[in-house]
Amino acid sequence: MTKITVIGAGSWGTALAMVLADNGHDVRIWGNRPELMNEINTKRENSRYLPGITLPSTIVAYSSLEEALVDVNTVLLVVPTKAYRDVLQEMKEIVTEPITWIHASKGIEPGTSKRISEVIEEEIPESLIKDVVVLSGPSHAEEVGLHQATTVTSAAKRMEAAEGVQDLFMNSYFRVYTNPDIVGVELGGALKNIIALAAGISDGLGLGDNAKAALMTRGLTEIARLGRKMGGNPLTFAGLTGMGDLIVTCTSVHSRNWRAGNMLGKGHSLEEVLESMGMVVEGVRTTKAAHELAEKMEVEMPITAALYDVLFNGNNVKDAVGSLMGRVRKHEVEAIPDLL
């Protein structure tokens, strides 16, 4: 039995805590809202982020980070990307032994454009890190909470570490594959949020299935293009954390990014959308980070650039569609030296 603390009591952190508890592990969950932690402990529900789902009685919630981390050997980080450094800086003052650091957040750090595993390795001393592992894939918290069949990927530099996390989570409704491509897995999970925003805009504008299919397909091309430039394996983007996550995020009403894009397509401002959502929409921050990365690394990402102009430069969504459709003629298939 593993002693594991989930850092972050949002919908995804809560759902993953359920999986771990169902597997018989000693599970704690930490959140910074005492009233929510009390509700989890007394009513066995997280009514704010995962309403209607009864949580296992073995999950213990804490609002004290120090108490939540007593004697743990594994932590699972599920917090917004912008909060990582603050949380990690607190944690490194509490943790005293090397532990496994798993993260299940899908984003790129604002300002630095770094992957979350890079942030962890920068903030946590090497003496406190046993392994850093990423857990990602097409997975809505609402469906995991209902024990609906879900499949994700565990990625780490050491395959033994990825397999260890696979063993932690795998059960009859939650299947885990392994992948050594931590760069590709992280980028696929983060960048698909950009395309989900664009797909939501397309649906909000009523552009139809043809346009949405094109956005998803060409969007995957952009993800793979930047991912390969940053060291990811092109094949990863055809897997669960690339194509798989893109499909589920672009087509489901559970997707925050799709819902946010849908509101933008219907004429709402970004400020109205973010206020209405009440939860983190990682795609907004990721669009900015990816646009900066693309310019820095000279990678062509036209959908990302068009969305960036809508979100941050006030461009009209209909004009953005026109600019994409009117681009110079191109070949569809690009030669990838690694594969050809």
From Swiss-Prot:
One of the protein's GO biological processes: glycerol-3-phosphate catabolic process
Cellular location(s): Cytoplasm
Binding locations of NADPH: 11-12, 33, 106, 141, 256, 280, 282
Pathway: Membrane lipid metabolism; glycerophospholipid metabolism
Enzyme class: oxidoreductase
Protein role: Catalyzes the reduction of the glycolytic intermediate dihydroxyacetone phosphate (DHAP) to sn-glycerol 3-phosphate (G3P), the key precursor for phospholipid synthesis.
Stated family: Belongs to the NAD-dependent glycerol-3-phosphate dehydrogenase family.
Name of the molecule in the record: Glycerol-3-phosphate dehydrogenase [NAD(P)+]
